[in-house]
């Protein structure tokens, strides 16, 4: 099942969506990187804008559903987690017993995360790795859990990233993904569209001097597969007991799968 609408471009390469714009697959990753280099210092503010502050509640729900144990040998891989926001929450929930590896393709995001880890005294419990979610630099069966929050929609080949998640998880390991989703309440959908397409780019220009980056982030949400379609993709990658929970009228959704 395709991760997004793809077609062959004029030069023979596969075309992908960069928001609502068609681009060659060789261009998409560099364009996404440019967006996140631009917003790295204001990433939490960006999520506050995109979610009206609700991302903090959703992330707490994600960690609560994961329920990390207070065990020193328990290891979690947080992908596209450069600023450390999810990893810090997981470590707190494990009473600082677990070990987290934060992976991101964007060095600017990782720099923010490293600074925050040092500031919060968590650096000994976290490894920061700059790498691609489609080609994880880890051996098979290395982690007890794989988390990704608001990142998988920016991966050019989502199906490949899901296969890599399955590969690096231990048997019995857990996959959890938090992502903006398909709003299912008609009245809420209209309100959120008005906020997203009209207010957010203007606020992005005001806060980060980059309205185009925020416009891409809004458009990328609309291009992401609907909940049932994404759940099917997770199953296709090999996961069992796949389920999802809608959050706040399905503005976001939590997807779960197990490696059995």
Curated annotation (Swiss-Prot):
**Which pathway does it operate in?**
Quinol/quinone metabolism; menaquinone biosynthesis; menaquinol from 1,4-dihydroxy-2-naphthoate: step 2/2; Cofactor biosynthesis; ubiquinone biosynthesis
Family listed: Belongs to the class I-like SAM-binding methyltransferase superfamily. MenG/UbiE family.
Q: What is the lineage of its organism?
A: Bacteria, Pseudomonadati, Pseudomonadota, Alphaproteobacteria, Hyphomicrobiales
Q: What class of enzyme is it?
A: transferase
Native species: Bartonella tribocorum (strain CIP 105476 / IBS 506)
Which UniProt keyword terms apply here?
Answer: Menaquinone biosynthesis, Methyltransferase, S-adenosyl-L-methionine, Transferase, Ubiquinone biosynthesis
EC number, UniProt record = 2.1.1.163, 2.1.1.201
Q: Which residues bind S-adenosyl-L-methionine?
A: 83, 104, 132-133
Instruction: Identify the coding gene.
Output: ubiE
What NCBIfam families has UniProt attached to this entry? Answer: MenG_MenH_UbiE (TIGR01934), PRK00216.1-3 (NF001242), PRK00216.1-5 (NF001244)
A single Gene Ontology biological process assigned to it is: aerobic respiration
Q: Which Gene3D superfamilies match?
A: Vaccinia Virus protein VP39
One GO MF term: demethylmenaquinone methyltransferase activity
Name of this chain's protein: Ubiquinone/menaquinone biosynthesis C-methyltransferase UbiE
Q: Which reaction does it catalyse?
A: a 2-demethylmenaquinol + S-adenosyl-L-methionine = a menaquinol + S-adenosyl-L-homocysteine + H(+); a 2-methoxy-6-(all-trans-polyprenyl)benzene-1,4-diol + S-adenosyl-L-methionine = a 5-methoxy-2-methyl-3-(all-trans-polyprenyl)benzene-1,4-diol + S-adenosyl-L-homocysteine + H(+)
Q: What does this protein do?
A: Methyltransferase required for the conversion of demethylmenaquinol (DMKH2) to menaquinol (MKH2) and the conversion of 2-polyprenyl-6-methoxy-1,4-benzoquinol (DDMQH2) to 2-polyprenyl-3-methyl-6-methoxy-1,4-benzoquinol (DMQH2).
User: What single Pfam family name could you report for this chain, choosing any that match?
Assistant: Ubie_methyltran
